[in-house]
C-alpha cells in the first residue's frame, strides 16, 4: 500500500535511443536496454543504440516528430516505435509553387 501523500503513477514511460548509423532516427522501447521485442534486422540497420532520454508518456511533454498516441500504441502492440527522419524539403518544388502563384496573381 502506498504511503500517504504518494500517488501511485499509472503513467507509461519510454526510453528513447538515437541511432549510431542513421541521422535523426530514434527507437522508443518500454524498458532501458531491453530490445528483446525489436526485430534483429531493424537492430542491425539501427546500429549501436545511444541513450537519448527517458520520457513519461503522460502528455505533459510533447514529442517533436512523433504522435504520442501512436507511440503508446506501438509500444503496447509491438514493443517498440521507430521514428524516422522527416522527409527532406524540396526547395525547388516550393520555389516553383510560389513562382506559379505569383504568375497566376499577375494574370488576374
From Swiss-Prot:
<dbReference type="InterPro" id="IPR027354">
    <property type="entry name" value="YcgL_dom"/>
</dbReference>
<protein>
    <recommendedName>
        <fullName>Protein YcgL</fullName>
    </recommendedName>
</protein>
<dbReference type="Pfam" id="PF05166">
    <property type="entry name" value="YcgL"/>
</dbReference>
<feature type="domain" description="YcgL">
    <location>
        <begin position="12"/>
        <end position="96"/>
    </location>
</feature>
<dbReference type="InterPro" id="IPR038068">
    <property type="entry name" value="YcgL-like_sf"/>
</dbReference>
Amino acid at each position: 500500500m502506498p504511503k500517504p501523500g504518494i500517488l501511485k503513477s499509472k503513467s507509461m514511460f519510454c526510453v528513447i535511443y538515437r541511432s549510431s548509423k542513421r541521422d535523426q532516427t530514434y527507437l522508443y522501447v518500454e524498458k532501458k536496454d531491453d530490445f528483446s521485442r525489436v526485430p534483429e534486422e531493424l537492430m542491425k540497420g539501427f546500429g549501436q543504440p545511444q541513450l537519448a532520454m527517458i520520457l513519461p508518456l503522460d502528455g505533459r511533454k510533447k514529442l517533436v516528430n512523433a504522435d504520442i498516441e501512436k507511440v503508446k500504441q506501438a509500444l503496447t502492440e509491438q514493443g517498440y516505435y521507430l521514428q524516422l527522419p522527416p522527409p527532406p524539403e524540396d526547395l525547388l518544388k516550393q520555389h516553383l509553387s510560389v513562382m506559379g502563384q505569383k504568375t497566376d496573381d499577375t494574370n488576374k
